[in-house]
């Protein structure tokens, strides 16, 4: 009888040990997986597990949105489709020139799929027309390129002819 009890007790303790061992292995595996997740999400600092999971979820959502955006861009580029996201039915490039006294401001919006225009070419047009460039900026946002040039007439009495500058700029961008 005692022998049966020992075997019964032995098997019960053996099952308990196996359960404990499996639980320990599971915890070790989860700890390893969380450390991998932490290295991908925030490699600079250690976060508690709940914050780590929240940050990982938001990071995955951002990545999914980025993949969708890039797939859409790829589809448009491969399809040769040039889509205008701005309001109205105006086509890009969009050039606007404003002049006030001896100061002239040029704004140009182009699609990235269009022929590239070098900023120095635009600046040289202003300089050749007798203007001193005060500011020249180039920005790339999403699928658009924005050029802004602000110039001032070198000789205020002579001034600058905005129509001539606009004509020359249109020749460059077309």
From Swiss-Prot:
Keywords in alphabetical order: DNA-binding, Nucleus, Transcription, Transcription regulation
One GO CC term on file: nucleus
Against CDD domains, the record matches this protein to: bHLH_AtORG2_like (cd18914)
Recorded hits in Pfam families, A to Z, give: HLH (PF00010)
One GO BP annotation here? regulation of transcription by RNA polymerase II
Q: What subcellular compartments does it reside in?
A: Nucleus
- PANTHER family recorded for this chain? ACHAETE-SCUTE TRANSCRIPTION FACTOR-RELATED, TRANSCRIPTION FACTOR BHLH167-RELATED
> What is the name of the protein in this document?
Transcription factor bHLH168
């Amino acid at each position: 009888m005692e022998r049966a009890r020992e075997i019964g007790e032995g098997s019960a303790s053996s099952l308990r040990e196996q359960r404990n061992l499996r639980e320990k292995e599971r915890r070790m595996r989860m700890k390893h997986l969380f450390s991998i997740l932490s290295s991908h999400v925030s490699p600079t600092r250690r976060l508690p597990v709940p914050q780590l999971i929240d940050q990982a979820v938001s990071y995955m959502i951002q990545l999914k949105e980025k993949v969708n955006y890039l797939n859409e861009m790829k589809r448009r580029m491969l399809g040769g489709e040039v889509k205008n996201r701005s309001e109205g039915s105006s086509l890009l490039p969009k050039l606007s020139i404003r002049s006030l006294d001896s100061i002239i401001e040029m704004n140009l919006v182009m699609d990235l799929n269009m022929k590239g225009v070098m900023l120095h070419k635009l600046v040289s047009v202003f300089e050749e027309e007798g203007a001193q460039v005060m500011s020249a900026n180039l920005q790339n946002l999403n699928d658009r390129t924005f050029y802004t040039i602000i110039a001032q007439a070198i000789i205020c009495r002579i001034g600058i002819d905005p129509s001539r500058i606009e004509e020359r700029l249109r020749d460059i961008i077309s």
